[in-house]
Amino acid sequence: MKSLLDLFKQFTPDEHFDAIRIGMASPEKIRSWSFGEVKKPETINYRTFKPERDGLFCAKIFGPIKDYECLCGKYKRLKHRGVICEKCGVEVTQTKVRRERMGHIDLAAPCAHIWFLKSLPSRLGLVLDMTLRDIERVLYFEAYVVTDPGMTPLKKFGIMSEDDHDAKRKEYGDEFIAKMGAEGIKDLLEGIDIDLEIEKLRGDLTGSEVKVKKNAKRLKVLEAFKKSGIKPEWMVLDVLPVLPPDLRPLVPLDGGRFATSDLNDLYRRVINRNSRLRRLLELKAPEIIARNEKRMLQEAVDSLLDNGRRGKAMTGANKRALKSLADMIKGKSGRFRQNLLGKRVDYSGRSVITVGPTLKLHQCGLPKLMALELFKPFIFSRLEQMGIATTIKAAKKEVESGTPVVWDILEEVIKEHPVMLNRAPTLHRLGIQAFEPILIEGKAIQLHPLVCAAFNADFDGDQMAVHVPLSVEAQMEARTLMLASNNVLFPASGEPSIVPSQDVVLGLYHATRDKINGKGEGLVFADTGEVQRALDAGQVELHAKISVRLTEWTKDKASGEFVPSTSLVDTTVGRALLSEILPKGLPFSNINKALKKKEISKLINVSFRKCGLKETVVFADKLLQNGFRLATRAGFSVAIDDMLVPPQKTEILARAEAEVKEIEQQYVSGLVTAGERYNKVVDIWGKAGDDVSKVMMDQLKVEKTTDRHGKEVNQESFNAIYMMADSGARGSAAQIRQLAGMRGLMAKPDGSIIETPITANFREGLNVLQYFISTHGARKGLADTALKTANSGYLTRRLVDVTQDLVVTEEDCGTTNGSVMRAIVEGGEVIESLRERVLGRSTAEEVLHPETRAVLVPAGQMLDEDTLEELEAAGVDEVKVRTALTCETRYGLCAKCYGRDLGRGGLINLGEAVGVIAAQSIGEPGTQLTMRTFHIGGAASRAAIASTVEAKSNGVIGFNATMRYVTNSKGELVVIARSGEVIIQDEHGRERERHKVPYGATLTVKADQQVKAGTILANWDPLTRPIITEFAGQVKFENIEEGLTVAKQVDDVTGLSTLVVIDPKRRGSAKVVRPQVKLVDANGAEVKIPGTDHSVTIGFQVGALIQVRDGQDVGPGEVLARIPVEGQKTRDITGGLPRVAELFEARSPKDKGMLAEITGTVSFGKETKGKVRLQITDPDGKVWDELVPKEKNVLVHEGQVVNKGELIVDGPADPQDILRLLGIEELSRYIVDEVQDVYRLQGVKINDKHIEVIVRQMLRRVVVENPGESGYIAGEQVERSEILNTNEQLQSEGKIPATYSNVLLGITKASLSTDSFISAASFQETTRVLTEAAIMGKRDELRGLKENVIVGRLIPAGTGLAYHQARKAKEAMDDAERRAIAEAEAAEMATTGSDEAPEVEGSGVESGSAE
């Protein structure tokens, strides 16, 4: 009876497991899984379609073909369940057991598992300490291996060829045992004493680095075997498991042919070869034949496990490689990525989208037919409830006939039932949002215009998918978390995502502009109603300046009530009418200006902060409706006459032509080199283009009009094109410049700039040549888009993979660490203010008033807009805030360190998957940036080179600590510091701006000088880098020999010659010398550096043009040589995306700069061929030296004092060096700034937090330096949380903890080295990850999101985190309860011996509360 009852139990998958372990199966284990041995290669009988007995599809082994029916048909139906038919041997049960029952094949000869042999590093090789080549020779029967040397001088593990073996046999007879094939290897593996080996190796971790490394590797593998209890000999198979037949199906096609899984072919080969080998062994066939068969069997097993890993892949009849077991799980179309991480789902549909301007923000229009199909089950159940249909079949009929009652039910079912809309590619979480469906006629989904920005959707044929959340929980989550009206901010930056665009912006902008002397100017109105009547009557026009009495509502801080205040406001008609839609609590001043796109965005942001979510959504909807209406009423049009070509254009072009001619002249007379000429020409044209566009915009911007007094005045233009660009609705100054200015410089396909620009614009029209030049850019744009979209997607995938397990797991980790934030100032401009950087972060320590030292903000408080206003008022210029990097939570992050949830506006909630959000925020713009290249049409967007710096504000000049300069003969101050900066301070001594000044620049200000804004502080030649002398003297050339170190360049045009330093590789002699200049004084003695006995030596690097003659007198600050700077390539995100990937992969840049390893004094040691020896001596006299290639530019000179981590050889910094020398905080700052630079160039806002989260994940592993009394090996990489836990335990036991140093891993490396093998295997290199995990017998704790998705549990984030925590708490309680009951029972039995069951009180209550 019990078994019958089991039938009705719903089969529930047991998801209450908390970890998964992977290991290697022993032969006993494989046999215990198996339901029988597969002896024959036959599959199914092609006539009867019944499986052959003992074959690959045998029903006796694997289970019946039809539910509850044996093969011969003797037993049918449920009553016989569990009976085994005596005729055909088949158990009567469900067919689905054919998906889970395995078989096995007993191999006649052992076979090595190819993964452990060939997946590098070869595990077999490590365990046996043999080379892969040797093991392969043994396994594939090319050589013998000695398994037992006996009394002979042969070595165990020794390899010998066939001939050697024969000779040794003759010599020693049967004294020794040597074997071939997997048997030999198996014997060796069985003979290994793991404990002994480990002890030997532990004692042997000394000696040369190579040896230590090798031993450590072996040690690791052996310890893994020991820990996991796996025996090494299991790497060689005696029994091969056979996959259940329904997982490798064989389907009859019509026409008597079969479609089969490749695995069946591979299994057939193994079985065939195995039975043949068995027969040969029984017949005692000659050794050589049996050997060949064993080799073939080994190859067949290899192919089954991983086809193509060794030798040529086995092919089927159609010459294509067969898909082996390994291929089934790896790659994009393998099990992990195809079926476990990306499933297709039921209850979904897709259709084209069109605009739904009448919808509210939380609604979408759903076509009736789609809704009918999607909500079918709901309709069926309702039909049954109402008694209209009795069965599902009847209900189906009813729905298909489409009676009116069905449509009524559909309306009812759909009410309050949100659906989710998704637009591919889903680049961030706003790519899926929930809406309430509104039934519409037609076949297209209607989408609210305001959510288009978040979906990145437009209506040119985009399609979207609809998904129905079925369960009540799913509906609730969709409604509370995913509803479009709850997602009004971008999670990347905290900016509003529901900002109107295009026509709406144009309508609002047009309506809020003001006009001089408009009709009705100066009238005063009582209220907006009166304004509306006057406008309708034609008494005033929309742009007229008027005064209106308006009532504003402000929130009373004490009571929280809104109090009205009425006043007369000067405004325009359009703005006054727009004021009616303002939510309470938003002052009118917010819309009393021309509403451009930025202003509207700010308006929505302010509304969100001041009035809350609900009001803002309503307000945004109203703005949208009004914008559409106003844009329609405005009657915009664009005519060719709106593109005004400036009359000054011809004059500017003529001037540029003249300048170019002059440069050509200078080139001809040899004053400039070819490279300089090109650079200067490109610069002239770049400037000319900018000038044209400036005068064009100036002309478009204003128009003349007469005011009330009849005077002619300028006012902002109402030109349609100008208004579109100015409002931010469509187009930009760059595009208008191409329409009405000049197209300007174009780039060649390789990115270099063509020096003749296109002087025409689109209004004038291009000639054939100009058109041809511009096709380069357009095509490059299209090609780039295609390539880079893929790259960007891959970057996002790697980012998500490295951060997917980072979730907010606790409120506060209690750390006091943090990082100090200041405003970012570059080139004198504040790029990012302090406010933008610290908004929404928590303070790490108290913020004090700079003057009174009063506490403004306590530690651990989140900084919001209001607090920051107070800080700004107090003049605070730096704040120490908590960051994701300094958070001390073990698994995950704490809410305090993360700060504000940018997508919601409050402190982040527990369970928020901040890792994935960070990855999406960085990856999403990547794709957009990549698609942005060709909009400019390849017009070369070359950054105009700066050649001066000017003060932006008034103040006092100061210089930074490293600034040094000399005064030259003209009395100018010449900078000779590599990292000099000019600082301007205000009257309180607070730094206002800071400018980098390059080496060789001329300073035009002195220290402590008062300057006004606009003063030029320094200037320099941007196209060359000078080499300057600091001291006076007479030039004495050394090693400057023509043909050896310098070449005379004679210009073919001018006949003039200059000396150019040439590359040492091209010099004739072997002795390498560095061309340099020494200075001698009047007496011929060498000039020394003051305070030392080093003589002044100035070296020239390759490519320098020497400007002085031997014996010439020079003064300080004079230029000895110039190095031309190569022409810049156009800056495009092309440089950007790879740059971001390079930073996150932590690659060492090529030609990287060198940082000083220690603090000390620089000197140059003995040179070698092609290299300079650079030495730094620290105060204790410790010397660090390094050889630097001569072509590198050394930034330091003899006797200079450098600090640890300072750049001493020019080039990009290596993040690994920064981490090693300057620490985590500097590294984080470097990566954040570099990544932000790339995005900022494209005008993309991303919060620093997201980048920090990624950096935290890149730093999550550490290298053990001194293992102490832990079980680690020095040099081993461990998860940071793991070593912290171990150390805590060691310290509590009074043992010596391990010491470790930080290590920076690239994102790919970090994803692969995660503790979760499931996540790593599904990312990349599946084989390697699984092999390693199997040997170590790894446990996956299922901490990350990916692992849980793969095993089909709720993810431990969001509501899932709460679910898992509650479940664990309940389990712990249940355990405690069970124990208590057991104890109580035991006590009861002991005391009374009565048989009454003890009552347990409150048990139900307790377990309920845990939920």
Curated annotation (Swiss-Prot):
SUPFAM superfamilies: beta and beta-prime subunits of DNA dependent RNA-polymerase (SSF64484)
Cofactor, free-text remark: Binds 1 Mg(2+) ion per subunit.
Enzyme Commission identifier(s): 2.7.7.6
Keywords: DNA-directed RNA polymerase, Magnesium, Metal-binding, Nucleotidyltransferase, Transcription, Transferase, Zinc
Domain of life assignment: Bacteria
Chain sites annotated for binding Mg(2+): D458, D460, D462
InterPro entries recorded: DNA-dir_RpoC_beta_prime, DNA-dir_RpoC_beta_prime_bact, RNA_pol_asu, RNA_pol_N, RNA_pol_Rpb1_1, RNA_pol_Rpb1_3, RNA_pol_Rpb1_3_sf, RNA_pol_Rpb1_4
Positions annotated to bind Zn(2+) 1: C70, C72, C85, C88
Region (Disordered): 1384-1411
GO CC field: DNA-directed RNA polymerase complex
Reactions mediated catalytically: RNA(n) + a ribonucleoside 5'-triphosphate = RNA(n+1) + diphosphate
Cofactor(s) in the UniProt record: Mg(2+); Zn(2+)
Residues binding Zn(2+) 2, per UniProt: C813, C887, C894, C897
GO biological process: DNA-templated transcription
Gene Ontology terms for molecular function: DNA binding; DNA-directed RNA polymerase activity; magnesium ion binding; zinc ion binding
Family of this protein: Belongs to the RNA polymerase beta' chain family.
Assembly and oligomerization: The RNAP catalytic core consists of 2 alpha, 1 beta, 1 beta' and 1 omega subunit. When a sigma factor is associated with the core the holoenzyme is formed, which can initiate transcription.
PANTHER family for the chain: DNA-DIRECTED RNA POLYMERASE (PTHR19376), DNA-DIRECTED RNA POLYMERASE SUBUNIT BETA (PTHR19376:SF54)
Known role: DNA-dependent RNA polymerase catalyzes the transcription of DNA into RNA using the four ribonucleoside triphosphates as substrates.
Protein name per Swiss-Prot or TrEMBL: DNA-directed RNA polymerase subunit beta'
Species for this entry: Paracidovorax citrulli (strain AAC00-1) (Acidovorax citrulli)
